[in-house]
Design a protein with these regions (language model features):
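N-terminal, non-cleaved signal-anchor transmembrane helix
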Residues: 1-71, 75
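Cytoplasmic-entry segments and transmembrane alpha-helices of multi-pass inner-membrane transporters
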Residues: 9, 84-123
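Transmembrane alpha-helix signature in integral membrane proteins
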Residues: 63-91, 204
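Residue-level signal for discrete positions within transmembrane alpha-helices
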Residues: 66, 70, 106-113, 154, ...
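Transmembrane helix boundary and interhelical loop/hinge segments in multi-pass membrane proteins
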Residues: 84, 96, 161-175, 184-186
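Generic hydrophobic transmembrane alpha-helix motif, especially the helices
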Residues: 109-151
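Glycine/proline-centered hinge or cleavage motifs at structural transition points of membrane proteins
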Residues: 115, 180-181, 194
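Transmembrane alpha-helices
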Residues: 161-162, 184-216
Length: 216
């Protein structure tokens, strides 16, 4: 065995164990820190409670409004982002050359890497005033503004996953469909998109999870 192979076979298990130990330590730390609250209030009271006053003389830790608001905003952001993401994926698959498609996907991946804090700041500086002005509201800090900013954040995930899946199925069926005289657009609508349904659902779940993580 070469020295490099020996080094790799020795370092990989150590790194894997280190990551696992870090994860276990994080879970234990959170459990230890949360234990006083779990003793003070039951799980039912925490999940169904409507008040959040952790610093009061008699602390109240109700999460129902926080959970419901997170679900609502995340679902609304998915409603905005999913049709646009699928449409963009179809356009990238059928409407542009492979070189332009690769450039667009690289740009989208770069957008996905923008930190959430920066996206939130831009949303606060741009989206909130725009919503306030457009709908003549007293304030633009609303569920609509939050969902639109979240939709921008999760859109790259949807586009990337859907494009990869759609392109895979398109290459698989396109030649046969053209041989049968079926147009590319009809092939996309009748064959490719139904075949990629599972991947589209998976990308939706991942995007929804990302949105929930940001809102919580």
């Amino acid at each position: 065995m070469h020295l490099s192979d020996r080094f790799t076979s020795g370092i990989v298990p150590i790194m894997a164990v280190s990551v696992l130990a870090l994860y276990i330590g994080l879970v234990l730390y959170m459990a230890i820190e949360a234990w006083p609250a779990l003793i003070y209030m039951s799980w039912t009271d925490i999940v169904t409670g409507t008040e959040w006053k952790p610093m009061a003389q008699s602390p109240v830790l109700g999460l129902s409004y926080i959970i419901s608001a997170s679900l609502y905003v995340s679902l609304l952001s998915l409603i905005w982002a999913l049709p646009l993401g699928i449409g963009t994926s179809v356009g990238l698959s059928l409407g542009v050359s492979p070189r332009i498609r690769q450039f667009c996907l690289s740009t989208i991946d770069m957008i996905a890497g923008i930190p959430s804090v920066i996206v939130g700041f831009i949303g606060l500086a741009v989206m909130v005033p725009a919503v306030q002005s457009m709908f003549s509201l007293s304030t633009g800090e609303s569920i609509l503004s939050a969902s639109l900013v979240l939709a921008f954040m999760i859109l790259p995930y949807i586009v990337t996953h859907c494009t990869e899946s759609i392109e895979t199925y398109r290459q698989r069926y396109e030649e046969t469909a053209l041989g049968l005289g079926i147009s590319p657009w009809h092939t996309m609508k009748a064959i490719v998109l139904p075949s990629a349904k599972g991947s589209i659902i998976l990308s939706s779940v991942l995007a929804f999870s990302r949105a929930m993580g940001e809102t919580m």
